[in-house]
Amino acid sequence: MAFLYSLCLLFQQHYPEMGSHQRANVCKYEHEIRVEATKNGIEPELLAAVIFVESSFHAEVVSSANACGLTQVVPRWTGGKETKKIKYTCKQLKNPITSIKVGAQILSYNTRVYAKGHRDKGLCYYNAGMKCITKKGFYKKSKYVKKVRRVYAKIVGGC
């Protein structure tokens, strides 16, 4: 497994198109990514790959679906068991530390509970919800899962 201390270099090496602000954010949030991923039983590299695919490390981004922050969490989907019954606003989710924490909690919960430990199904569920679990093979066709896996492979394979 790769170690997170090299994330800055790996993203710089494998994604030269990233702007200097994005690369700075990778470095800036490494510690939080490592802490929250470990606390939630997921690989830091996987969480970093999710953040890259979701927001390219832009903390202020809001999608057309009202997903907010680095991990692109939709506020209305917070407040359940995934987030320990805490409801978050878009403003709160734009805080990088909060976004990393909440994204890690949701990804971990989805993978453990809904996907029964299956990483790709958990990633699909994080992005597209229940159809990833109920529609047989849906997760295998997910472009999102393929993107995250590609980024993850570069991070892990780049060491």
Residue spans for each PLM region:
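Short basic/hydrophobic patches in alpha-helices and adjacent helix-turn junctions
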Residues: 105-113, 128, 150
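Export/targeting segments at the very N-terminus of extracytoplasmic proteins
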Residues: 2-57, 97
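A short, structured beta-strand-centered segment in the mid-to-C-terminal lobe
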Residues: 88-99
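Short, functionally critical alpha-helical segments immediately adjacent to catalytic or ligand/cofactor-binding
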Residues: 42-58, 73, 100-104, 122-128
